[in-house]
Amino acid sequence: MKLHLLKSKIHNAIVTSGDLEYEGSITVDSELLKKADMIPNEKVLVVNNNNGERFETYIIKGDHGSRVIQLNGAAARCALPGDEIIIMTFCEIEAEEAPDFKPMVLIVDKNNNPKRRHRIGEEDEQLG
């Protein structure tokens, strides 16, 4: 049996902009993607901490070091610049692997600078 588990998340990111005219997606700084073990085109679940909205989209790679978190297309209606969000990816693994699986958590500050990261159940790695 396969289980659908959290793979990684960027916690408390701040939306920097939105583009309603774009076809859809979320643009994320490529440095943050790498630190969070996420890749372009990966499906994400996004939670808006300001209003409780949840929506799915996919990742577009933003410029390295830009700290961009931009919602595009219809997703731009789900959160406004300045809103705090959580960006999550998921994976399927065999049930017997689940007890040892440890998702990656990247915590960012109010300017989307990486502060620390850890695998759930392990110690933080300080980043900034």
From Swiss-Prot:
Its EC number is 4.1.1.11. Heterooctamer of four alpha and four beta subunits. Catalyzes the pyruvoyl-dependent decarboxylation of aspartate to produce beta-alanine. Is synthesized initially as an inactive proenzyme, which is activated by self-cleavage at a specific serine bond to produce a beta-subunit with a hydroxyl group at its C-terminus and an alpha-subunit with a pyruvoyl group at its N-terminus. The modification Pyruvic acid (Ser) is found at residue 25. Binds 1 pyruvoyl group covalently per subunit. Substrate binds at residues 57, 73-75. Keywords: Autocatalytic cleavage, Cytoplasm, Decarboxylase, Lyase, Pantothenate biosynthesis, Pyruvate, Schiff base, Zymogen. Pathway: Cofactor biosynthesis; (R)-pantothenate biosynthesis; beta-alanine from L-aspartate: step 1/1. It catalyses: L-aspartate + H(+) = beta-alanine + CO2. It comes from Chlorobium phaeovibrioides (strain DSM 265 / 1930) (Prosthecochloris vibrioformis (strain DSM 265)). It is found in: Cytoplasm. NCBIfam families: panD. Belongs to the PanD family. GO terms for cellular component: cytosol. This is Aspartate 1-decarboxylase.
